[in-house]
Amino acid sequence: MSQCGLYCRSLSQEHEIRIALPTIIAKDVGMKTIDLITLRRDFHRAPELGFAENLTKARIAAILTELGLEVFEGVGVVGLLKQGSGNRAIGLRADMDALPIFETSTHDYVSQNPGTMHACGHDGHMTMLLGAAAILAKDPDFDGTVVFLFQPNEEHGLGAQAMLDEGILERFPIQEVYAIHNLPGAPLGQVSTRTGQICSSESLFEIIIEGQGGHASMPQMGRDAITIGAEIVQALQTIVSRKLAPGAGVVVSVTEFITNGQRNVLPGQATLKGDVRARMPQDREAVAKLMKQISEGIAAAHGVSISVAFNTEFIETINASGPTEAVVEAAGAQGLETIPNREPMSFSEDFAHFCQAVPGCLLLIGNGQEGPYGQPLHASNYDFNDALLPIGAAFWAQLVRDRLAKPAGEQGDNV
């Protein structure tokens, strides 16, 4: 496949580097509307937390308007690009929010909001989607409607549902929906996805033990909430090891053990908090049931009262077969390395709510393996790889042109 070049500045060098792209967007690369690297770094300098992405939303809306899209602002930002007479529509989603993390990077575009950081690559996700909007606005070689969905508050699992509750899909009906998430440690531009469950659910639990406090020198006079809590912590681990099938992909983690005890005072109360990840809804429901049974059984044995709360923050993300096949085909057309049946991920994504409403696909794309690009998501020294920006934008454009292809005889010349 012949290639053309899109130039962008290197992170580590003063000279320019060439990013190879397929000829399908050869006519697009002369576009000067958006400097993707500058835009991404601007987003990185000005991170905003979930449901407070006000400056971010304003910047996105202004860019989409400048590109000639119809723009609608609400919980998030929606850009509408129509071409031809086709009645098909697809949605492309990017998340906007940052994390409450102090950045420890030393590059010249570190967060200017201390304690807030784009540590999950949402700055890059937004920029890739805006790049795709620029490509498609300049050369709308498709037939139908593209709905660009810029979503708030992914990190708390609330933004997607908020957009749905606002009636976004009733106002802008789509037949399919797609999202990209970068994957640190994977080779740059490597696309991986799968049909079926790709991201786990996340549930939070809180167990409150009401014992009887007493003097540390006379434990027999009380009901030690710490000892009871420790027994529960150990017993909860048997859910994964003895109650569920091997390979179920369930994780049960106690992350907090809180008491009201003092140096010489046995606590009368203890609180256990933690996190559960599950690949399948039935496993998530089984964990909730078993957690309650185990905790209440141990409490009864010790003669104390107990309460168990179990709340699901993120549901499982389930990719539909048709959109997943489309992603694999588009990635292949772009010459990208593709893993079409990757292992499910243990992290969670509220894009799941979009996939529950319409057939969709979440794909992962490699962020690179060196330096800050290989650091884990949510690490204070993580960074999105700018070399991925044109790759992601070109992929989005390819997917749109594939899924909203013009009727035979109306195809444009993309060479």
Can you say where each PLM-predicted feature lies in the sequence?
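Short, Lys/Arg-enriched N-terminal segments with co-localized hydrophobic residues
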Residues: E14-G30
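Acidic/His- and Gly-rich active-site-bordering loop/insert found
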Residues: A26-H118, D123, T127, A134-F142
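Divalent metal-coordination and catalytic microenvironments
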Residues: F43, L92, H122, F148, ...
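Histidine/acidic-residue-rich, glycine-tolerant segments that coordinate divalent metal ions
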Residues: V77-L80, L99-I101, T106-M117, D123-G124, ...
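Non-cysteine beta-strand/loop elements that form the S-adenosyl-L-methionine
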Residues: G91-R93, F102, F205, L362-G368
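Metal-dependent amide/peptide-bond hydrolase catalytic core
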Residues: A230-V415
